[in-house]
Amino acid sequence: MSSMKSVSALDNVVVKSPNDRRLYRVIELENGLCALLIHDPDIYPEGSVPDQIDEDDEDGEEEDSDGSSEDDDDDEDDEEDGEGDEEDEDEDEDEVKGKGDHQTKKAAAAMCVSMGSFLDPPEAQGLAHFLEHMLFMGSTEFPDENEYDSYLSKHGGSSNAYTEMEHTCYHFEVKREFLQGALKRFSQFFVAPLMKTEAMEREVLAVDSEFNQALQNDACRLQQLQCYTSAKGHPFNRFAWGNKKSLSGAMENGVDLRECIVKLYKEYYHGGLMKLVVIGGESLDMLESWVVELFGDVKNGSKIRPTLEAEGPIWKGGKLYRLEAVKDVHILDLTWTLPPLRSAYVKKPEDYLAHLLGHEGRGSLHSFLKAKGWATSLSAGVGDDGINRSSLAYVFGMSIHLTDSGLEKIYDIIGYIYQYLKLLRDVSPQEWIFKELQDIGNMDFRFAEEQPADDYAAELSENMLAYPVEHVIYGDYVYQTWDPKLIEDLMGFFTPQNMRIDVVSKSIKSEEFQQEPWFGSSYIEEDVPLSLMESWSNPSEVDNSLHLPSKNQFIPCDFSIRAINSDVDPKSQSPPRCIIDEPFMKFWYKLDETFKVPRANTYFRINLKGAYASVKNCLLTELYINLLKDELNEIIYQASIAKLETSLSMYGDKLELKVYGFNEKIPALLSKILAIAKSFMPNLERFKVIKENMERGFRNTNMKPLNHSTYLRLQLLCKRIYDSDEKLSVLNDLSLDDLNSFIPELRSQIFIEALCHGNLSEDEAVNISNIFKDSLTVEPLPSKCRHGEQITCFPMGAKLVRDVNVKNKSETNSVVELYYQIEPEEAQSTRTKAVLDLFHEIIEEPLFNQLRTKEQLGYVVECGPRLTYRVHGFCFCVQSSKYGPVHLLGRVDNFIKDIEGLLEQLDDESYEDYRSGMIARLLEKDPSLLSETNDLWSQIVDKRYMFDFSHKEAEELRSIQKKDVISWYKTYFRESSPKCRRLAVRVWGCDTNMKETQTDQKAVQVIADAVAFKSTSKFYPSLC
């Protein structure tokens, strides 16, 4: 190990919130590596730091150790998937964190290397991402491919990594006393990785499987089209994902791929380009000694970052691209190329413009286009990913989800956007708007909620590349300098000549389609008429409906803390108390005495009369709620800018309303919401738009095979779940008259169960309950009229199979989801949950190691407990574009048969590692008020009310021996056991043939019709 010392060490240089108790030190090693060391006193709240434990464990494999951020952009259009209604939110693997007396936090680290996909050689595209994968495949000191992740998994940790355009980030978290051992293994990524030839072929397949997850994603397809149609030779003009074709194809063309990644590694993986963050409970001196010792052997190198050559604009001006969508969507995507603005971070001119162009209040583009019936959502700004924020340019985007009529008005919409830009130029930059953003930024910084340690480490390591060290935390929040001239200069780039237009729609048809070569997506390139370009350049007028937003009424001024005691012993903290228990409502209350921030979270579950009694009622309720959200949007949006968030969702017959954030304005916002909800009746124009949006959502349901398999499983498990195709059919016939007739009945009887948690006194919580009483003068809904879901009880020895084809006819991925039904929860018992969680902890890595790393079945290989309306189960899931469901199920079955041997061979020390790691997870301290609220709320929603659930589960785990786990496995997973009850859901990709099932039908019950199956099934009593 290195005998190097740090060249410099700076304490108290990092600007941090006055509420942040952590200590920060910045050090620089002789090799140029810069490290931010963070001492978190809450990791060892008891004060004494025990000796670190380092074991040379050699079992297991990766948990979730790779993934490229630009490759996983899977959030596009999720709000239109229509899948949330069917997926049981009670089926949640994250149970309540116990409020025990030994709560602990994890330690973590992250390394950001200043090189990314922009440096891929043209002959081997995706190389930087491939290199990221290869660093997990063992090092000289720790040659086993799974050593790093095996160590983390055994000690309550996990890892991840992602490749961006100009940097690559690796990060992990681990149980606090194993930080040094984890750092030993982690540091070798950057000292002596093996990058073995025999591992390369497998990891090419892993990269290819990862690419196949993105293949049918419209956001990824659009991004790649934008790269492909950028100027030839420009760094944007590349394929950053990488796949088998780009990597194996390079080898077939004579490229030595290993030589390429070794060259890339040697050239850029050196201290001068590395930023390390380590978070631990040890002293800063101890953390510094570890970093110096373990990272001192990293190669020396210059701090000068790689320079990129780019001449001319990224895209041709005056062009419109029409991209055929996978989903039923209409999206107008506009981009303007700005100069790089990282050095102007204290002024944030791009955020000022994003605030106005993306605003949703009265007078905004969003409000205007919505009133026209052309748009359903609008967002604007410079994205956080590397392709939008680079040293070459900032790319300012505006994404507008269109209605059918909006699709026909694209040029008109763009015309109004340039009218709004003219308005902004005419009124000139407004300092009061900047001051609002400044106040909100400072407020958010001062009272920032703590993140999980590994996320925080990764964020700060990225920020070390972006900001001076003193602003690695504050840089994202700061609005320090008002510079109207810079804003005016920036607005000079918002011209038609500097604008790229993309339209993504399922409706695009043409005989002149071109093909983007990597994704195979179809697109058309068109010239925008010159007359339009000229009219956009100089609008003759600005519509009177467009104007600047009003001043924000929800920015708080009162930050006083309600908790009197300065330091409260965790042991003395009480659970939520029921302060109101009446036929109309039940209110739970807990004053926050832990985080002491001026925030509160108020959650409400509102049972509505007859909301789930039939598919028609269900749809009318959804229509009403979606129209109500539409009506509330301007108020809710304004509050969200001031960090006071609102969500409104449906779960069965229950409307869930959440209002959370800075507490001062919560009563005012709730009063406004309920006043509108009390009397709201929709109009025909908005009814048509919302109905169209819902229809599109149902058509887009289950386009992703993984979502589809989960949906099918829940469809068979839940007694009353309305099929999305049936809902689409019934929705088509519903009218506004149907809805207006239904609303009074829906609102006639309700029951509310609520939780008020945070910086609220008991009197304030009671006042919130009174807002409901005063606003909603309705009758209470009797308990017998509230819907309670029942779960199918599979018969003894059940071996069920459900086969369906993928919904998207171009989807190559197949999925097998194998579900084992265990038992319903027993009252006040945590034993089943404890065994399930421990079983998962033990088998997760061997499963990943066998089926993904060794057999390369696919990118998604996972398992875990499932809790469906308080009925326990366990799932194995594999998604593959390479193999069909029969083969996948066979390999999963083979692994399950081998589990008994795996458990038998597990030595006592390893078993104890897994058990103590699981206990550490359960007793991990909630990182934020919001996290604790969500834990408490899950107990209320499930009607369990065991607010110390995880503490009890941890205690239960201490009594569970290896023989208990083996016995439990034999009871529920061994095929000969009558209690082995399983359901295999198989979703068949477009390249597979379901006729394979004909040779695979022995001793199984094939379910052809879910309704018919449930009509003859037995059900467990409803528990929630």
Curated annotation (Swiss-Prot):
GO biological process: proteolysis
Glycosyltransferase as UniProt keyword: no
Molecular function per GO: metal ion binding; metalloendopeptidase activity
Annotated stretches, region: Disordered: 41-103
InterPro entries to which the protein is assigned, alphabetical: Metalloenz_LuxS/M16, Pept_M16_N, Pept_M16_Zn_BS, Peptidase_M16, Peptidase_M16_C, Peptidase_M16_M, PqqF-like_C_4
One Pfam family, short name: PqqF-like_C_4
Cofactor(s) recorded in Swiss-Prot or TrEMBL: Zn(2+)
Substrates-to-products reaction catalysed: Hydrolysis of polypeptides, preferably at -Xaa-|-Arg-Lys-, and less commonly at -Arg-|-Arg-Xaa-, in which Xaa is not Arg or Lys
Binding residues annotated for Zn(2+), in chain numbering: H129, H133, E210
GO cellular component term of the entry, any: cytosol
Keyword Nucleotide-binding belongs to the record: no
Secretion signal, residue range per the UniProt entry: none
Function noted in UniProt: Cleaves peptide substrates on the N-terminus of arginine residues in dibasic pairs.
UniProt record similarity statement: Belongs to the peptidase M16 family.
Name the UniProt record assigns to this protein: Nardilysin-like
Record organism: Arabidopsis thaliana
